[in-house]
Amino acid sequence: MARIFIFLLPFLSADVCLAKSFPMPLVIAHRGASGLLPEHTLEAYALAIEQGAHFIEPDLVITRDGILIARHENELSDTTDVAEKFASRVTTRMVDGKEVTGWFTEDFTAKEIATLRAKERLPFRNQASNGKFRIPTLDDILVLVQRESVRSGRPIGVYLETKHSTYFRDVGLALEPPVIRALTNAGLTQSTDWVFIQSFEIDNLRSLDTMTDLRLVQLLGVGHLTPYDQQDSDKVLTYESMMTDGGLAEIATYADAIGPWKSLIIPQDREGNLLPATDLIFRAHRAGLLVHAYTFRNEPRYLVKAYNGDPAAEYRRFFALGLDGVFTDFPATALAVLAE
């Protein structure tokens, strides 16, 4: 870790990293430039940075020997060649209350993970890079961000998500302590640093709030669902109740922002017609919370008919509401709209 800490020092100087404010709205590269390259690879992150993204968004899971790596979930077969290389290691686990069969990060060492290569998750996207790129560790990502910040002369942020937090804690591999150690070793400890840490769960964010001054983000899913770590609670809590004025005030006691599904801001009916925007952004701002919405994608299959297949039209509508940031698979598109 000492090597990484020394290497990152130029990135952490006040004129590069410790900006007092962020651009508004932020363009957050969702799993990197994942619309063009396999998600959560150094190459996808680097492309997003080259395109001008303000932040890259690594999802974090952990290996058997406690190394943080970037994957959207702990089951590896959808985004790597693990099934071909480790066919006999298939197993079944209960993850966040669901039975899942596959190959899991917590069953592999970091050395074994390093032998895997990434592949495109979605069959309708370009498959040409399958098998070319490895699975990065969090330390790899921090080094990339440092290098590209120095090269480009601008701050580049990391927007981390802890995945399956309760699950990993219960199997003895809690994510939060190694996340904070890695960031601390990189000199990233202050609320002014270009770092956010997000989660769909609650208790881990409350714990993180006691561990760090870095900015925390409460993700918000489909309204009727309950955060996984709250499902056994005596208190009935749903994402919908968390979006009431009282719920937002409670979030503001431990987090700095919310990350809602974009349909919680501009809903649509079953035919895909847009309905009037909700007042979630206004009320979140009133509670002192930033609002970063997910997920924006270019493909027509992800756009409601009101946008006529034009992703720029979607961005314009959301930006006009005062949104503070977007998670996007195509950061270049969002940045082009901001430049209009």
Q: Where do the model's predicted regions map?
A:
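Bacterial N-terminal signal peptides
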Residues: 3-15
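Phosphate-group recognition and catalysis centered on beta-loop-alpha active-site segments
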Residues: 17-340
